[in-house]
A protein has these predicted regions:
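A generic structural motif
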Residues: 43-48, 104-110
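Regulatory modules associated with amino-acid/nitrogen control
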Residues: 1-95, 116-131
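Short acidic/polar capping segments at secondary-structure boundaries
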Residues: 29, 103-104, 113-114
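A short glycine-rich beta-strand->turn/loop micro-motif centered on a GG-aromatic cluster
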Residues: 95-103
Length: 131
């Protein structure tokens, strides 16, 4: 698939903003209530709703993130989708944390930058729905 085809994905794209606020934490082991757990040979990272943190022990925390989920099928052959999204958000001064699963992609943005992120994605042609 050509990189230029991403314009079609932006124009027909849909994204959903979660109502929850998330924390990204570094832990020694997986969190039971986590949205996502990423393990590599150096660390374990959990993405978890802040309301579910409870007495969770962690080695580091970065909170106040909101999740934007791209509610669309993005084929593995698609080139440049995240480059376009991350580039536009970077140009708008929005830092991101991303997670991709087999069929769904998510971008986490700081709460105070959420409105800027939504407007930026809308300028790309996406329709955004807030939960």
């Amino acid at each position: 698939m050509k990189r230029s085809d991403i314009r079609t994905y932006f124009k027909n794209g849909r994204a959903v903003v979660s109502a929850e606020t998330y924390a990204i934490i570094k832990t020694k082991r997986a969190c039971a209530n986590a949205f996502a757990v990423i393990k590599d040979d150096r660390e374990t990272t959990c993405v978890i709703e802040e309301s579910r943190l409870g007495a969770q022990k962690y080695l580091g925390i970065e909170g106040d993130w909101r999740m934007i989920t791209f509610d669309m099928l993005l084929p593995f052959s698609l080139v440049g989708f995240f480059a376009g999204v991350s580039g536009a958000l970077a140009d708008a001064g929005v830092n991101i944390f991303t997670i991709s699963t087999y069929t769904t992609d998510h971008v986490f943005v700081k709460n105070q930058k959420l409105d800027i992120a939504v407007k930026t994605l809308e300028k790309l042609g996406m329709s955004i729905r807030r939960l």
